[in-house]
From Swiss-Prot:
A Pfam short name: dsDNA_bind
Top-rank taxon, per record: Archaea
Organism whose genome encodes this protein: Haloquadratum walsbyi (strain DSM 16790 / HBSQ001)
Chain segments carrying region Disordered: 1-55
NCBIfam families hit by this protein: PRK04239.1
Record field: compositional bias (Basic and acidic residues): 10-23
Family: Belongs to the PDCD5 family.
GO function term, MF aspect, one: DNA binding
The protein, known as: DNA-binding protein HQ_1105A
GO cellular component, one term: cytosol
Signal peptide: none
Amino acid sequence: MSETPDDLDELRQQRMEELRDQADGQQSQTSDNTAAAQEAAREKAEAQQEALLKQHLTDGARQRLNAIEMSKPDFAEKVKKQLVTLAQSGRIQDRIDEDQMRELLQELKPDSKSYNIRRR
């Protein structure tokens, strides 16, 4: 079994390539599992959020929130997070109706910038 140094180098090279291929396969499989787990966790959190909102909002308030979500998705997300926080902390006793939702939206509404234009 006397192999020449060239044969040994060639065998080493083949073995290194096999090991690299195995490592690449494991990494891609691990990243797929991680992405799937993150997606499942995100969906679970969204389902919990929707359940809390359904529990604490009347139909009118939910319709108002959905209308805002269509026009201003970022603002609607901020409102939803605030409502979930209030519900989880126990600061919402009854269901929020449309009038209370209007008040909450007024409080959370970003300050509008006003510009004064002076003519000279």
